[in-house]
Amino acid sequence: MGNTITEKILASHCGKKVVEPGEFIEPKIDIALSNDVTAPLAVKEFRKTGIKKVFDKNKIALVMDHFTPNKDILSAEHVKFVREFAKEHKIKHYYEGGNVGVEHALLPEKGIVVPGDVIIGADSHTCTYGALGAFSTGGGSTDIAAAMATGKIWFKVPNSIKFILNRKLNKWVSGKDIILYIIGLIGVDGALYNSMEFDGPLCKKLTMADRFTITNMAIEAGGKNGIFTPDEITENYVAKRAQRKYKFYISDKDAKYLKIYEIDCSKILPQVSMPFLPSNTKAVKDIKKTYIDQVVIGSCTNGRIEDLRVAASIIKKGKKVNSNVRTLIIPATPEVYSQALDEGLLRIFMDAGAIISAPTCGPCLGGHMGILASGEKCASTTNRNFRGRMGHVESQLFLVNPAVAAASAIKGYIASPDEI
């Protein structure tokens, strides 16, 4: 019996030929990640160990992205605390202020995470890096403390579920719609503690941006990780960014899967995830007219340059966003911001009446920079729509792709791009 890509990566980091689903392992890690919300506790727990040095100052990433720019005294104190730790241990990958980007867009862009890696992050959307053909998963702050001390992490090898993506995409359909459709199909626990492996003919036509979006939301189906088979598209993205050597792993043809889903992607239309679960999905065309108060285009899910290009192309047609809709544009990283500036995208957004933000997680977690009041509704390109996720518990959040978000900003209700 062969092995899956996830099993191969984990085995290689355990110094073993094979690992089996259900086996408890302690693989060596390539990157331990934390942010301004989770790092303070990780640092405190690390110090409790009595260990004087981190295992490798080049294999730790601390990204102060959630409340940047610091929204209050407490967030400023947290960042100061982590900054001092980073200086003390000479952490190479420390990002704050004008250098900071949303972590799950920033690390691949910088080449800090590469194919074949094992990555642990104190953030549930760490599964994003599987788009590169890496094993990446979220953990708690105490897990990161242990990883910073030992260079290893302890967990159980997951079973794998394979999603074979077939046919071609309809107009205005993107990676966001694929993953929303899949989550709607299997539910928020449909891949609980399983590796979600994406393969099939369509994958070779998906951009890296689409792949990052898909793996980013694997956790919304309960997945331990999401992962793509690396290919030429991966190579073209990684080769010019990687800060170190990398390796492509590919599942064996006779690898064992818990389940296999064949997804006819030609049947997928632009999706909307209704409150209050990512699995509560419908086609945009099938929902009743839903007026909104805010649109957010950004996040680790859809804040890349490709996403902003799509949004700008639609907003340019409509010329102005609806006067009743606060429209927030949040480039995921400084590089994305700079590129959007050079391409004239930010001018399109500004002329349309949108708000341009510095890179931040801000509204996605209900932190700041776009909080919802009681009864308000928001169409957002983010990844979660639990009750109270973006503000008041009586607000409502609808997850959509950038094209639908842009169209909705113009029309004032959740709309198809074809309406513009």
Curated annotation (Swiss-Prot):
Q: Which residues bind [4Fe-4S] cluster?
A: C300, C361, C364
Q: Does the keyword 4Fe-4S apply?
A: yes
EC number(s) given by UniProt: 4.2.1.33
Catalytic activities: (2R,3S)-3-isopropylmalate = (2S)-2-isopropylmalate
UniProt keywords, alphabetically = 4Fe-4S, Amino-acid biosynthesis, Branched-chain amino acid biosynthesis, Iron, Iron-sulfur, Leucine biosynthesis, Lyase, Metal-binding
Q: Name one GO biological process term.
A: L-leucine biosynthetic process
MF terms in GO: 3-isopropylmalate dehydratase activity; 4 iron, 4 sulfur cluster binding; metal ion binding
Superkingdom assignment: Bacteria
Broadest EC class? lyase
In terms of Pfam families, this protein maps to: Aconitase
Pathway assigned to this chain's UniProt record:
Amino-acid biosynthesis; L-leucine biosynthesis; L-leucine from 3-methyl-2-oxobutanoate: step 2/4
Q: How is the cofactor bound?
A: Binds 1 [4Fe-4S] cluster per subunit.
Q: Which cofactor does it need?
A: [4Fe-4S] cluster
Subunit: Heterodimer of LeuC and LeuD.
Q: Cross-referenced NCBIfam families, in alphabetical order?
A: hacA_fam (TIGR01343), IPMI_arch (TIGR02086), LEU2 (TIGR02083), PRK00402.1 (NF001614)
What task does this protein carry out?
A: Catalyzes the isomerization between 2-isopropylmalate and 3-isopropylmalate, via the formation of 2-isopropylmaleate.
Family membership noted in the UniProt record: Belongs to the aconitase/IPM isomerase family. LeuC type 2 subfamily.
Which PANTHER family does this one have? 3-ISOPROPYLMALATE DEHYDRATASE LARGE SUBUNIT 2 (PTHR43822:SF16), HOMOACONITASE, MITOCHONDRIAL-RELATED (PTHR43822)
Protein name in UniProt: 3-isopropylmalate dehydratase large subunit
Q: Which organism is it from?
A: Endomicrobium trichonymphae
Q: Which gene encodes it?
A: leuC
